[in-house]
């Protein structure tokens, strides 16, 4: 298959990708500041909250870039503008920290792709919200730990994340899911569910 044929073949085989028709994905993608020509698209990942798509754009004769396009679940995130304000603020802060330490913010931090009018996300005519990130190539993620070392590496990464955010102005963050970080309340909810089961 050529890239164009692959793009068409995937859509014809699947008909719909994770619930959103192909024409809609193309139309939404066209509203972001992506570089290049869209040549392929398909569902991405194993998540259960947002609709996630992997898009590949051809840049020039030989190069290409992959991006992630996500439709934010409005049932879970009822104030997506606050969610995206949090993400933009935190990722901006992390990029500065990574640069200060001589790291590579393109690989170590999520990079939002703005809409063509410079916003962090898009609200379509149906009130659905979409965001886009540069895909980090050669990165690995796990749904389940495969060995004890995976737990260790997860803890190291989480510790590094917390360290870099130690001086972030937490008072500027919005609570995007009520009581999500209330450990006592979450634990009580778990206990109640266990008792009912």
Give the location of each predicted region.
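Conserved ATP-binding subdomain of kinase catalytic cores across diverse folds
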Residues: 41-43, 48-58, 64-195
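Juxta-kinase regulatory segment immediately upstream of eukaryotic protein kinase catalytic domains
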Residues: 17-39
């Amino acid at each position: 298959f050529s890239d164009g044929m692959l793009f068409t073949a995937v859509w014809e085989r699947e008909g719909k990708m994770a619930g959103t028709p192909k024409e809609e994905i193309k139309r939404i993608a066209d509203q972001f500041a992506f570089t290049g020509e869209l040549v392929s698209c398909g569902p991405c990942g194993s998540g259960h909250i947002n609709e996630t798509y992997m898009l590949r754009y051809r840049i020039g004769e030989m190069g290409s870039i992959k991006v992630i396009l996500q439709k934010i679940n409005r049932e879970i995130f009822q104030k997506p503008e606050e969610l995206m304000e949090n993400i933009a603020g935190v990722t901006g802060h992390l990029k500065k920290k990574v640069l200060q330490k001589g790291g590579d913010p393109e690989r170590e931090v999520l990079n939002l792709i703005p809409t063509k009018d410079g916003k962090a996300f898009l609200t379509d005519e149906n009130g659905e919200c979409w965001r886009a990130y540069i895909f980090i190539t050669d990165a690995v993620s796990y749904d389940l730990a495969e060995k004890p070392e995976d737990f260790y590496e997860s803890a190291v990464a989480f510790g590094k994340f917390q360290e870099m955010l130690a001086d972030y102005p937490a008072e500027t963050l919005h609570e995007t899911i009520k009581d999500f970080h209330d450990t006592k309340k979450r634990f009580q909810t778990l206990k109640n569910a266990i008792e009912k089961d």
